[in-house]
Amino acid sequence: MAVIKCKPTSAGRRHVVKVVNSDLHKGKPFAGLLAKKAKSGGRNNTGRITVRHVGGGHKQHYRIVDFKRNKDGIPAKVERLEYDPNRTANIALVLYADGERRYILAAKGMQAGDQIQSGIDAEIKAGNALPLRNIPVGSVVHAVEMKPGKGAQIARSAGTYVQVVARDGAYATLRLRSGEMRKVPVDCRATLGEVGNAEHMLRQLGKAGAKRWRGVRPTVRGVAMNPVDHPHGGGEGRTSGGRHPVTPWGVPTKGYKTRSNKRTDKYIVRRRNKK
């Protein structure tokens, strides 16, 4: 995988930094694992904007990724690695011994031809998925479930991982990249190793148009708006907003805690590190 800084042949190329992976499949994705992906433009069923800065972008197919890894005891071979426009990580097309194909997240170091497996009898190596009760303490894992059988929810982005730091009774304690320490049932599954494509963080799009290709619309500052649109809006000439930074709905936006799910507080051993 190479990080390439483009030559400044134009204003739009001057700041572009690309991540090029020659191992990725250059053809079309596997048609049997594609689904339609309709664009919402950030609107809900009433037509109102519920998510700002969303709209446009290149048409995409959704790749159906296996986050449950519940095909136990059947070895699988990695056929190829592919780009996925719906996530920062790359995905791997795997062929099971019984003929079924599935997409999974590509782990760091995974290559075409590798053998992987799921289940309690799987070997302790990158790409294999096991319940947390069968994973040694101190191991680095990704794609971790929060509820048994629900599918992976933690550590799915490019370059992310979680460390298993303890196991006590029915729960395993995980250290997340944010510094948070969290308990998860030991029957939840996780995949060994880190998520691949860690160089994704070095990428620079270089121009506004590249954001638009990805369906991201411009972000307008509150101080540039009118009073009807934002608490920072209005004033004669340029102003600083006149109050502590808030969202368009008046909620403080710099370090203000908004977590309100008290039901799951008991699973958080330590909150994340302050930046």
Curated annotation (Swiss-Prot):
Protein name: Large ribosomal subunit protein uL2
Task performed by this protein: One of the primary rRNA binding proteins. Required for association of the 30S and 50S subunits to form the 70S ribosome, for tRNA binding and peptide bond formation. It has been suggested to have peptidyltransferase activity; this is somewhat controversial. Makes several contacts with the 16S rRNA in the 70S ribosome.
Molecular function GO terms recorded: rRNA binding; structural constituent of ribosome; transferase activity
GO cellular component terms given for this protein: large ribosomal subunit
Keyword RNA-binding appears in the UniProt entry: yes
Key words of the record: Ribonucleoprotein, Ribosomal protein, RNA-binding, rRNA-binding
Region spans: Disordered: 223-275
Subunit (UniProt): Part of the 50S ribosomal subunit. Forms a bridge to the 30S subunit in the 70S ribosome.
PANTHER family in UniProt: LARGE RIBOSOMAL SUBUNIT PROTEIN UL2M, RIBOSOMAL PROTEIN L2
A Gene Ontology BP annotation from the UniProt entry: cytoplasmic translation
Family stated for the protein in its record: Belongs to the universal ribosomal protein uL2 family.
